[in-house]
């Protein structure tokens, strides 16, 4: 710990020691804080003494267990610690003590893992997760953790928590995430007092700061007479985690590898090691340091340590971005005039009276893209497109939306032009995507992306293929370019979607919605957003470390529509309606070990103690085969280095009350991970309801266009469950068996217990009256007209399958015409929903006043 550094830094800044801010239990009705705050919290000294375990059964049938305990507290230490190994013993006793310094602002969960050491490695017997908020300051706490009730296996640990002498420190927090000040260490290698270099080798220094953003860095040792600039190094680290710069002197040798290839294999030998206590260095001043490496060897470094405690380069908060708020002010004027005309109002509405309407397009590849063109055309013909504030989509719908927004005035001109251009690309051959010229283009573009530091995946290649499918030429556009299309409020505000997933969990088990807009990219769950121009750049602890060019939109289109980034389990889930049930036998168990009768355990922000018992390496191998994703888009994690707030479980988007949900495992959540794994939002819910339902957007009416071939109400049912888990107002979805058998063109859902619930107008993709009507009220007459309308969308040999990207012209126009017609044919229901949304909005305004 930076024992001396923190008091000096705090003294320089003259921070008031305000003490810890305790957040009270609240209803899960919205974000805790709309904006970030600076808060001051104390430090605590934690002593963990691992005493003993009893009745432990190992994995070796011929001998007793060789036990040791690993302790991991990632909010206080960059690496795990462990006890010694007690060999061949069922009742091992350690009596080993470990010391930590923890910060009062963050959620500190200690992981205690019991291992059985064997020749080839270590077998995990059990894992305990213990929320340190269970401890009372100043009171020793001896805890016996049950590991197996059947044979009385137990682990005994003693905790002592004391108020630290280190002064309290200030953090930036939004009530879910916490940003500590960032420590930057910069240095230059000035020379060394080591022996001369060997004839067949070269010496280099390896420098590392545990927990730093940067990996260990190798610096070549050069003679003082050698020209050129001296080698430099830089590290960024959370000062709560690291206190020391480690220096190792390495000798690099070259050995000839035996075999016909005669390749050279690099070998290194450690000649010495040393380190520098970072707290011994003055802040903001360059310091000359000499590091002893042992046996008379030393190296000279010039170092400067600085603390970054100013504003962040990302936004922590649950309010809308400035760009979106400015858009809303302008868009309300457009919507007000449109509503006056559509509903026949005597005068235009005041800005506070204008209801918020969102159009949501589901996933479905080319089918969804083509259908959304038709739905939007229908809204435009009815004069309803200007009543829409938000336009959002999943997967294929995002392809339609992102193409439209190439024109900053797209909604103000007839959509026939964009539809005709889309038809040209959808109905043309895609063989050119695999031409020699295009393959060279893909190789070149992916090479540029990889050299810029990005982790290139199959989804990046898919993005280049999507670029060809949509435009058949290079598209230089970036998402931030679309700011021009919303600056005056002339179009609805576009919200593109993806979900951050785990590589070995289904989207239904864990998916964090990530929104992409012209102004910001971010996670509403965490209240963390970066400017769109910075997506893909490297941030750590909320600070920009490495600026990268904003990715072209084709890479985002590939991510938004990456339906193939799935696992075998998810394939069965989507095709058969249920996952692979036999996998449950291979999963480990999770049990609650709390004694809920103890009064200190009733803190609503405290996570209950959980015991995880794995099934073994073979079971894990089986799970990996069936649950691992084929691919995902790996992006720099802009939340990396941030910590979870001590009361994060009160956040609206967290379901940590489900003890087995990943939200209840804070050490594994996104801020603790190096990369984001972003995939098609359809893996969670095949329509972007969660982003439209954010309380800060206050959507009154949702026009839901579902372009799936089957289960026309699945997205509504899944959204209903999603909202129920999180306490989000949503109407009751009640559908009769006859509608499940054969859906109608439009459904209005407005019944809800909570008056803040939005109205949902749902349009399944069905061919009902379009089959017999050329237009609303106009029946088909000629054989040609009847043949055009007489088709089954979801027949076994449907041309609208997910993996079909090329349509015949008639199939394309049928789909667009059907989607357009279903909107036009329900104009009265649309007007009724708008009027109801207006009435509810005004009623809420009056109640609020």
UniProtKB/Swiss-Prot annotation:
Its EC number is 3.1.1.4. Expressed in myocardium (at protein level). PROSITE patterns: C2, PLA2C. Coiled coil: none annotated. Ca(2+) 2 binds at residues 60, 116, 118, 123. Stimulated by cytosolic Ca(2+). It catalyses: a 1,2-diacyl-sn-glycero-3-phosphocholine + H2O = a 1-acyl-sn-glycero-3-phosphocholine + a fatty acid + H(+); a 1-O-alkyl-2-acyl-sn-glycero-3-phosphocholine + H2O = a 1-O-alkyl-sn-glycero-3-phosphocholine + a fatty acid + H(+); 1-hexadecanoyl-2-(9Z-octadecenoyl)-sn-glycero-3-phosphocholine + H2O = 2-(9Z-octadecenoyl)-sn-glycero-3-phosphocholine + hexadecanoate + H(+); 1-hexadecanoyl-2-(9Z,12Z-octadecadienoyl)-sn-glycero-3-phosphocholine + H2O = (9Z,12Z)-octadecadienoate + 1-hexadecanoyl-sn-glycero-3-phosphocholine + H(+). Its cofactor is Ca(2+). It is an enzyme of class 3 (hydrolase). Ca(2+) 1 binds at residues 60, 66, 116, 118. The keyword Metal-binding applies. Its main location: cytoplasm. It is a peripheral membrane protein. GO terms for molecular function: calcium ion binding; calcium-dependent phospholipase A2 activity; calcium-dependent phospholipid binding; lysophospholipase activity; phospholipase A1 activity. Residues 27-145 form the C2 domain. One of its GO terms (cellular component) is vesicle. GO terms for biological process: arachidonate secretion; cellular response to antibiotic; glycerophospholipid catabolic process; phosphatidylglycerol acyl-chain remodeling; prostaglandin biosynthetic process. It is found in: Cytoplasm, Cytosol; Cell membrane; Mitochondrion. Has calcium-dependent phospholipase and lysophospholipase activities with a potential role in membrane lipid remodeling and biosynthesis of lipid mediators. Preferentially hydrolyzes the ester bond of the fatty acyl group attached at sn-2 position of phospholipids (phospholipase A2 activity). Selectively hydrolyzes sn-2 arachidonoyl group from membrane phospholipids, providing the precursor for eicosanoid biosynthesis. The N-terminal C2 domain associates with lipid membranes upon calcium binding. It modulates enzyme activity by presenting the active site to its substrate in response to elevations of cytosolic Ca(2+). This is Cytosolic phospholipase A2 zeta. It comes from Homo sapiens.
């Amino acid at each position: 710990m930076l024992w001396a550094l923190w008091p000096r830094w705090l003294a320089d800044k003259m921070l008031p020691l305000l003490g810890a801010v305790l957040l009270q239990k609240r209803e899960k009705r919205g974000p805790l804080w709309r904006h970030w705050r600076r808060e001051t919290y104390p430090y605590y000294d934690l002593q963990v003494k691992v005493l003993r375990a009893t009745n432990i059964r190992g994995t070796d049938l011929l001998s007793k267990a060789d036990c040791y305990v690993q302790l991991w507290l990632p909010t206080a230490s960059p690496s795990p610690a462990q006890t010694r190994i007690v060999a061949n013993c069922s009742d091992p006793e350690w009596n080993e003590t470990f010391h930590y310094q923890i910060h009062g602002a963050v959620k500190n969960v200690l992981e205690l893992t019991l291992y059985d050491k064997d020749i080839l490695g270590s077998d995990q017997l059990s894992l305990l997760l213990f929320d340190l908020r269970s401890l009372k300051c100043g009171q020793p706490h001896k805890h016996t953790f049950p590991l197996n009730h059947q044979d009385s296996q137990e682990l005994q640990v003693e905790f002592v928590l004391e108020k630290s002498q280190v002064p309290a420190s200030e953090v930036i927090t939004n009530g879910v995430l916490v940003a500590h000040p960032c420590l930057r260490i910069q240095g230059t290698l000035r020379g060394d007092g080591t022996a001369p270099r060997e004839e067949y080798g070269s010496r280099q220094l390896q420098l590392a700061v545990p927990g730093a953003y940067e990996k260990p860095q190798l610096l070549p040792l050069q003679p003082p007479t050698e020209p050129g600039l001296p080698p430099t190094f830089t590290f960024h680290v959370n000062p709560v985690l690291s206190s020391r710069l480690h220096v190792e002197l390495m000798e690099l040798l070259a050995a000839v590898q035996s075999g016909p290839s005669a390749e050279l294999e690099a070998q290194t030998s450690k000649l010495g090691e040393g380190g520098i206590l970072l707290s011994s260095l003055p802040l903001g001043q360059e310091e000359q340091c000499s590091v002893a490496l042992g046996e008379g060897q030393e190296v000279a470094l010039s170092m400067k340590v600085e603390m970054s405690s100013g504003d962040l380069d990302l936004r922590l908060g649950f309010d809308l971005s400035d760009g979106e708020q400015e858009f809303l002010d302008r868009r309300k004027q457009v919507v007000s005039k449109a509503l006056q005309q559509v509903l026949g109002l005597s005068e235009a509405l005041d800005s506070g009276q204008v209801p918020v309407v969102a159009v949501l397009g589901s996933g479905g590849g080319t089918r969804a893209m083509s259908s959304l063109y038709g739905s939007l055309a229908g809204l435009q013909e009815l004069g309803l497109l200007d009543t829409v504030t938000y336009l959002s989509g999943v997967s294929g719908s995002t392809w339609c939306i992102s193409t439209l927004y190439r024109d900053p005035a797209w909604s103000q001109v007839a959509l026939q032009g964009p539809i005709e251009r889309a038809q040209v690309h959808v109905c043309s051959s895609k063989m050119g995507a695999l031409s020699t010229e295009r393959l060279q283009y893909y190789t070149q573009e992916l090479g540029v992306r990889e050299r810029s530091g990005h982790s290139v995946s199959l989804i990046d290649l898919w993005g280049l293929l999507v670029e060809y499918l949509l435009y058949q030429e290079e598209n230089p556009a970036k998402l931030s370019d679309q700011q021009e299309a919303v600056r005056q409020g002339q179009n609805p505000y576009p919200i593109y979607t993806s979900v951050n997933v785990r590589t070995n969990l289904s989207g239904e088990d864990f998916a964090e919605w990530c929104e992409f807009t012209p102004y910001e990219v971010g996670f509403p769950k965490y209240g963390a957003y970066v400017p769109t121009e910075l997506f893909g750049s490297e941030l750590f602890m909320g600070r920009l470390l490495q600026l990268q060019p904003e990715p072209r939109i084709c890479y985002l289109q590939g991510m938004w529509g990456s339906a193939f980034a799935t696992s075998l389990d998810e394939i069965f889930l989507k095709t058969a309606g249920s996952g692979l049930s036999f996998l449950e036998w291979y999963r480990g168990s999770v049990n609650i070990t709390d004694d809920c009768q103890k009064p200190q355990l009733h803190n609503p922000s405290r996570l209950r103690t959980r015991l995880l018992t794995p099934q073994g390496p073979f079971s894990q191998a089986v799970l990996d085969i069936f649950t691992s994703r084929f691919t995902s888009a790996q992006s720099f994690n802009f939340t990396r280095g941030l910590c979870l707030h001590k009361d994060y479980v009160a956040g609206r988007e967290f379901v940590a009350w489900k003890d087995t949900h990943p939200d209840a495992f804070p050490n594994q959540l996104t801020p603790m991970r190096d990369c984001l794994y972003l995939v098609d939002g359809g893996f969670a819910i095949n329509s972007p309801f969660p982003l439209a339902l954010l309380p800060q957007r206050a959507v009154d009416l949702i026009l839901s266009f579902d372009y799936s071939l089957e289960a026309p109400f699945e997205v509504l049912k899944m959204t209903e469950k999603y909202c129920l888990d999180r306490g989000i107002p949503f109407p009751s979805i009640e559908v009769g068996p006859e509608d499940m058998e054969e859906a109608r063109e439009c459904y209005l859902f407005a019944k809800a217990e909570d008056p803040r619930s939005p109205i949902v107008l749902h349009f399944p993709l069905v061919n009902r009256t379009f089959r017999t009507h050329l237009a609303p009220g106009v029946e088909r007459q000629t054989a040609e007209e009847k043949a055009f309308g007489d088709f089954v969308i979801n027949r076994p040999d449907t041309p609208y399958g997910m993996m079909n990207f090329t349509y015949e012209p008639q199939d394309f126009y049928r789909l667009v015409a059907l989607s357009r017609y279903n909107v036009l044919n329900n104009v009265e229901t649309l007007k009724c929903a708008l009027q109801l949304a207006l009435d509810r909005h005004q009623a809420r305004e009056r109640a609020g006043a």
